Amino acid sequence: MKRPSIDEYYLNIAKAVSERSTCLKKWYGAVLVKNGEIISTGYNNPPRGEPHCWTCTKCDSGKDMATFATCPAVHAEMNAIISASRNEMLGADLYLAGYSVKTGEPIECEAWPCEICLRLIKNAGIYRIINKKGVIYMRSEDGILKPLKERIN
């Protein structure tokens, strides 16, 4: 058996984290890592105390969830950021994994942060965002988080 690279290792953990999601369409997992240590994890799920997605009629409608701006889920990245302190996140890496609930296969867009999550990631001081395609965002010398790869939709 081949030993996974460090990025593969953390992406595998992000996949395992995603399996906690109750979403009926897609599972997302996020792992925040700093200096080789996991500081936080998150998966897409409704806010604490609210009904799980199993009761969501939007998912049962057969429509593409991207059209549902009112989806109650808190994104994986948001949950990971909420669970970590700002000092821990400064300079940390964020690993993202996304999977289809039906097939268990990685989703085509390879787990990219939405615009709101990207704003939170920038403000949290996260240094890099990594998905299956590799490093997709990285903070430049001027401190700005910039895309390194084009998003696939």
Language-model features, listed with the residues they occupy:
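Short, basic/aromatic recognition patches
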Residues: 1-27
